[in-house]
Amino acid sequence: MAKVIGIDLGTTNSCVAIMDGAQPRVIENSEGARTTPSIVGFTDSERLVGQPAKRQAVTNPSNTVFAVKRLIGRRVGDAEVEKDKKLVPYAIVNGGNGDAWVEVRGEKYSPSQISAFILQKMKETAEAYLGESVTQAVITVPAYFNDAQRQATKDAGKIAGLEVLRIINEPTAAALAYGLDKKDTKTIAVYDLGGGTFDITILEIDDGLFEVKSTNGDTFLGGEDFDMRIVNYLADEFKKEHGVDLTLDKMALQRLKEAAEKAKIELSSSQQTEINQPFISMDRNTGQPLHMVMKLTRAKLESLVADLIKKSLKPCEAALKDAGVSKSDIDEVVLVGGMTRMPRVVEEVTKFFGKEPHKGVNPDEVVALGAAIQAGVLQGDVKDVVLLDVTPLSLGIETLGGVFTRLIDRNTTIPTKKSQVFSTAEDNQNAVTIRVFQGEREMAADNKMLGQFNLEDIPPAPRGMPQIEVTFDIDANGIVSVSAKDKGTGKSQNITIQASGGLSDEDIEKMVRDAEANAEADKKRRELVETKNQGESLLHSTRKSIEEHGDKVDPSTVEAIELAMGALEESLKTEDAGKIKGGIQNLTEAAMRLGEAIYKASQSETGAAPDEDGPRSVDDDIVDADFEDLGENKRK
């Protein structure tokens, strides 16, 4: 039975894990790392994912996409998207349906597509380790993701060639990994501050039962925001000193971002770090190069990001209130996400909950481990684990006057189904439009619109007379279906909510085909590189053989080999793998003649060496005598 893998699709880094016996295990990628940067780079000839993409980001900033998770399921015009446009070096554009897409090298990609490239890398990592094909996965999302973001994540899995068996909330996955072997009853808080999102989840764990009591968060608060505070500080200081605005230079901005991330990490274990960026710009008056050499202290960093840390505590208050528990009722605080390595974050969380956080989990890996456990549960490999999750936001419809009427309140355990009867607003109204929203505001327009559909052919009747039953159904992935039924006629209409933009089935199928075509192109590219390496290696070894033994063979043989070498060198300048293979074959055959000639020359020298005392037969040579002596010695 094929393995189901667990994937933590992160803003900054991603991670893949499987169940190895009774325990989850993180799989190392092809570079030997346990996490993979969630970065995709596009060069002239290929697409790079992970560390190779990160390495070339400074020299190729406009074509290197990072933190795309912050765009997934979002619309152009959203405040978060407009903010991101000013911060990232790549282009964020309208996908044609109002969704935020990215544009690289003149081609548009949806955030789901970019995420799919990262998921493909995770899939390949697992396949290389397992030695078999992987087709099914459990993928994690921030607990506070809305329906559009969850659907877009599921689409990303499909584009990557994965059947997504379950979308699971990141804090819930972390709780699974934390509590898998724990038998006692505990109420825990999972504080998850990652690269781009923040979640807080309150759970009750009782011998294999994981019940989420409440969840809250901010899908636009994370390490990327901390990095940008440092970037802006460095750019401001540099501008004060040199009068040059580095934020206008995409390459300099990318260098600053990398330096900021490095400085932030270093300041988690030291009090001060030096940011050294030589030749980062040029003096406009003198033409002399400008260098950035600046010291950053932990205290200064903490002052730059103090409000961001405080911002994470408001959802904590809301989650405790929704769960109906006090801070003193929390038995354990589990920290998740790379940002929880920052000492000031730990201090603030400790102060808020009044207890030291649990330090027994790896914040970068625990979510993927939890996803693998959930995969094991779905596959039947993990027994006695029951997971009860919740919907993070209230769901409802727009009613008369633009009011948001809730059908399902936030923090309702899922899967769930709820119905409510509505009526018409006007006499003889023959159709109603059901507009579905998700959020906590009282007016529908202030919430996130998930979609709309019409129920038509309602028999003429006075207003308030027809009975229209609206039913909301949320599955275990947190994805919503809505139906409306005229109880008088029995006529019904239903939809699985797709964001008002979103990807259609046709879009997804096209992207799946593109991904498959790209996989084939990537395979050919890898084959070409390997063939070129083989050709270079053969040229080197043949050249060395000619230098050492060329005088032992006739000139015509050497000439034939040199001709074959020249032809191979020319073919290596092309991108034609078939031509290169032909060149390798020809040179291999020519080089074999060199080997034969060297061998014959060697035999001739050994067998026909003259003796000063007269001719001597081969039988008189000492080889036989030596052999006999060795035999005697062995018998002794």
Curated annotation (Swiss-Prot):
Induction: By stress conditions e.g. heat shock. Residues 620-630 have a biased composition (Acidic residues). Residues 601-636 are annotated as: Disordered. Keywords: ATP-binding, Chaperone, Nucleotide-binding, Phosphoprotein, Stress response. The keyword Phosphoprotein applies. The keyword Secreted does not apply. GO terms for molecular function: ATP binding; ATP-dependent protein folding chaperone; unfolded protein binding. InterPro entries: ATPase_NBD, Chaperone_DnaK, Heat_shock_70_CS, HSP70_C_sf, HSP70_peptide-bd_sf, Hsp_70_fam. The modification Phosphothreonine is found at residue 197. Pfam families: HSP70. It comes from the Bacteria. Acts as a chaperone. Belongs to the heat shock protein 70 family. This is Chaperone protein DnaK. It comes from Cereibacter sphaeroides (strain ATCC 17025 / ATH 2.4.3) (Rhodobacter sphaeroides). The gene is dnaK.
